[in-house]
C-alpha cells in the first residue's frame, strides 16, 4: 500500500541518531472500584492522554457498571507509532507497558499501518470494522507570528511550495525584509512514531504531485516528486522524534529571547499551536498556566495544497484478551466521550470535535483560523501494496534534537 511505501521509503529520516521515541508513560486514571471490577485498559496518543485521563476519571465518578460489575478505566500514554509497532510485534508488557484493550492513536493512518503489518506477518486481525472518532486536529505548519506575517499570513494562502521556495533562496529571510532572521529553518518529527511527522511527509508528497487523493507508487517514483520532497527535507535543520521536542526547545529559546532564531517552521497538529501559545507545550491540563505565555507566539499555516486530519479513532481491539465485558465498557465510555460534555472538554483544549468542527478557541487571536483548512487530503489507500522504497537521499545538514519522553504523537 502507498502509506507503507511512504513509511518504508522514508526510513532514511530516522537514521540521524534518533531513539525509539515512543514517548510513553504508565500513568492511569485512578480506579474507584472494589471487588470484581471490569478494568478497561486504554492506550492513548500522548497529546491527548492526560486530558483523556481526566475524562475517564469524570466518567468513573458516575459509577458506570457492566452486567452489574463496576467499571474502572486505566489510561496509558504512548506515541502512536510506538503503540502501532508494539501491537504489530505482539505487545511485550515488560518493554511496551500495559497491554491495551482500546487503542486511540492520533490518526487512522496508524490503524491502516497496523492492519498491513499484521497481515504481512500472518498474525490475526486486531482492528474492528468500525473505528469511531473522538476528536480531530488538522496538520498545520506552525510558524512564529512575525515570520508568518512577513509571508502574508493570515490573508495569503501559503503552503509547502512557498516553504520550498524560501528554503532554496540563499538570501533566506532577507528576501522578505528580515536579514536578521537568517536562513529558513524547518523542523520535522520522526514519521515512524510521530503523527505530525508522518502526515507532513505524506503532505509533502501530495504537494509535489498536486494531487489531493489517489497517490500512486508511480507518483512516488517520479523524479520531479522526489526532487520536490528532497528540497523540503534540505530545509530541515532540527530533526527529532516528537512534536514536544521542538515545542519544548522552542519554549526554552523563547524564554531566552531567541524565539525567532531557533526555528522558522515545524509541522504540528493545530491544537499544539494553542498549547505552545499558552506556555504549555506538553498539552497536559495539569501544567496549563504554570509557565508564562511565549514572547513570540506561533500561528498555524494551513497548507494551500491541502492537509491531513488527525482524526483520533477509538479502536476496540479484536484480541483474545478483550472479552465481552471489556467491549461493553469500551462502548459505554465511547458514548460518554462523544456526548456534549466531553466534546466541549476536548474543545477547551483546542481540539476539534469528531466531525472536525472547530470550537471557540480556534480563532485568529490564538493563531488559528476557523475557516481553514480549505481542503483535506485523502490518505493513501491501504489496499495498494508495493515493495517500492525509492526516496530522496538524506540531507546532510540535518541534525537530531533527540528524544523527549511523553511527547505528542
What function would you assign to each model-found segment?
Residues 128-141, 226-236, 240, 288-320:
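Periplasmic-binding protein-like
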Residues 43-45, 153, 167-175, 181-197, ...:
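Short beta-strand->loop
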Residues 1-21, 315-409:
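Extracellular/periplasmic juxtamembrane helices and adjacent flexible linkers that interface
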Residues 9-120, 127-128:
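Early extracytoplasmic/lumenal segment of secretory-pathway proteins
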Residues 118-193:
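A conserved helix-loop-strand patch within extracytoplasmic ligand-binding domains
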Residues 37, 70, 97-99, 127-129, ...:
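Extracytoplasmic
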Residues 147-153, 207-215, 320-330:
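Short helix-loop capping/hinge motifs at secondary-structure junctions, enriched
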Residues 203-300:
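Ligand-binding pocket segment of bilobal, Venus flytrap-like solute-binding proteins
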Amino acid at each position: 500500500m502507498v502509506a507503507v511505501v511512504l513509511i518504508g521509503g522514508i526510513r532514511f529520516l530516522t537514521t540521524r541518531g534518533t531513539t525509539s521515541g515512543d514517548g510513553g508513560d504508565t500513568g492511569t486514571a485512578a480506579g474507584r472500584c472494589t471487588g470484581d471490577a471490569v478494568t478497561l485498559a486504554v492506550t492513548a496518543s500522548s497529546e491527548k492522554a492526560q486530558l483523556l485521563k481526566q475524562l475517564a476519571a469524570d466518567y468513573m465518578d458516575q459509577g458506570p457498571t457492566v452486567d452489574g460489575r463496576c467499571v474502572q478505566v486505566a489510561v496509558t500514554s504512548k506515541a502512536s507509532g510506538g503503540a502501532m509497532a508494539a501491537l504489530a510485534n505482539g505487545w511485550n508488557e515488560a518493554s511496551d507497558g500495559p497491554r491495551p484493550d482500546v487503542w486511540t492513536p492520533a490518526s487512522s493512518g496508524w490503524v491502516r499501518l497496523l492492519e498491513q503489518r499484521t497481515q504481512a506477518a500472518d498474525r490475526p486481525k486486531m482492528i474492528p470494522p468500525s473505528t469511531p472518532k473522538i476528536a480531530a486536529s488538522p496538520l498545520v505548519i506552525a510558524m512564529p507570528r512575525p515570520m508568518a506575517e512577513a509571508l502574508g499570513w493570515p490573508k495569503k494562502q501559503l503552503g509547502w511550495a512557498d516553504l520550498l521556495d524560501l528554503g532554496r533562496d540563499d538570501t533566506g529571510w532577507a528576501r522578505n525584509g528580515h536579514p536578521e532572521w537568517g536562513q529558513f529553518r524547518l523542523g520535522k518529527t520522526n514519521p515512524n512514531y510521530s503523527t505530525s511527522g508522518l502526515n507532513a511527509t505524506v503532505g509533502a508528497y501530495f504537494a509535489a504531485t498536486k494531487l489531493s487523493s489517489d497517490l500512486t507508487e508511480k507518483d512516488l517514483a517520479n523524479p520531479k516528486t522526489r526532487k520536490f520532497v528532497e528540497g523540503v527535507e534540505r530545509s530541515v535543520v532540527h530533526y527529532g522524534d516528537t512534536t514536544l521536542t521542538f515545542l519544548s526547545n522552542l519554549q526554552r529559546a523563547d524564554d531566552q529571547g531567541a524565539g525567532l532564531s531557533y526555528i522558522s517552521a515545524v509541522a504540528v497538529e493545530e491544537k499544539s499551536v494553542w498549547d505552545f501559545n499558552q506556555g504549555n507545550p506538553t498539552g497536559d491540563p495539569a501544567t496549563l498556566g504554570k509557565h508564562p505565555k511565549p514572547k513570540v507566539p506561533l500561528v498555524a499555516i494551513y497548507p494551500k495544497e491541502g492537509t491531513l486530519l488527525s482524526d483520533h479513532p477509538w479502536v476496540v481491539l479484536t484480541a483474545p484478551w478483550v472479552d465481552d465485558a471489556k467491549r461493553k465498557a469500551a462502548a459505554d465510555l465511547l458514548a460518554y466521550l462523544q456526548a456534549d460534555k466531553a466534546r466541549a472538554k476536548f474543545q477547551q483544549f483546542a481540539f476539534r470535535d469528531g466531525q472536525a468542527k472547530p470550537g471557540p478557541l480556534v480563532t485568529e487571536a490564538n493563531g488559528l483560523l476557523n475557516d481553514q483548512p480549505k481542503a483535506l487530503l485523502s490518505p493513501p489507500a491501504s489496499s495498494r501494496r508495493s515493495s517500492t522504497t525509492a526516496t530522496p537521499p538524506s540531507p546532510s545538514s540535518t541534525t537530531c534534537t533527540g528524544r523527549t519522553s511523553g511527547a505528542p504523537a
